[in-house]
């Protein structure tokens, strides 16, 4: 069995849409049995659970760091302050990144993916 880890950045919906199209193409192209796991947070997790209700054990919530929303997109000032300070129920960005990389590493070690695909997720690149 071929095991794939798909890591989807949760800010906006473009990352999710691209990964779902890619996932459909992979299922069409790869012959044989594949085991796909998804990782993200917030609204993307909700979409994944709705789309794959029978695969809850393969949907992993990892709290990926994202910008703090402002009125018309990301709030640059709040996101910059969040580097060191907790802002709007978000722990400091440094703490978020450390926790995020730790959780992602645990998932990699546990699942032993044959292939990792990410869209907007920086952790896979750092851990590589």
State the predicted function of each range:
Residues 77-118:
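Conserved nucleotide-sugar donor-binding subdomain of glycosyltransferases
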Residues 1-5:
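Extreme N-terminal starter segment of soluble prokaryotic enzymes
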Residues 44-47, 116-128:
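An aromatic- and histidine-rich active-site surface loop
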Residues 6, 35-38, 115-117:
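Short catalytic-loop micro-motif centered on adjacent basic/acidic residues
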Residues 21-34:
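A short, Lys/Arg-enriched amphipathic alpha-helix followed by its capping loop at the start of a domain
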Residues 10, 33-93:
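Conserved nucleotide-sugar phosphate-binding/catalytic loop shared by glycosyltransferases and other
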Residues 8-20:
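A short, glycine/small-residue-rich beta-strand->loop->alpha-helix junction that serves as a flexible
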């Amino acid at each position: 069995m071929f095991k794939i880890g798909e890591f989807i950045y949760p800010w906006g919906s473009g990352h999710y849409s691209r990964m779902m199209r890619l996932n459909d193409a992979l299922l069409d192209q790869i012959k044989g049995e594949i085991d796909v796991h998804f990782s993200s947070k917030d609204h993307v997790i909700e979409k994944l659970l709705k789309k794959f209700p029978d695969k809850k054990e393969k949907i992993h919530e990892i709290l990926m760091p994202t910008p703090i929303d402002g009125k018309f997109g990301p709030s640059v000032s709040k996101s910059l302050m969040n580097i060191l300070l907790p802002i709007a129920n978000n722990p400091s960005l440094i703490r978020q990144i450390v926790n995020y990389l730790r959780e992602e590493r645990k998932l990699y070690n546990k699942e032993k993916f044959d292939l990792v695909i990410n869209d907007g997720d920086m952790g896979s690149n750092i851990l590589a």
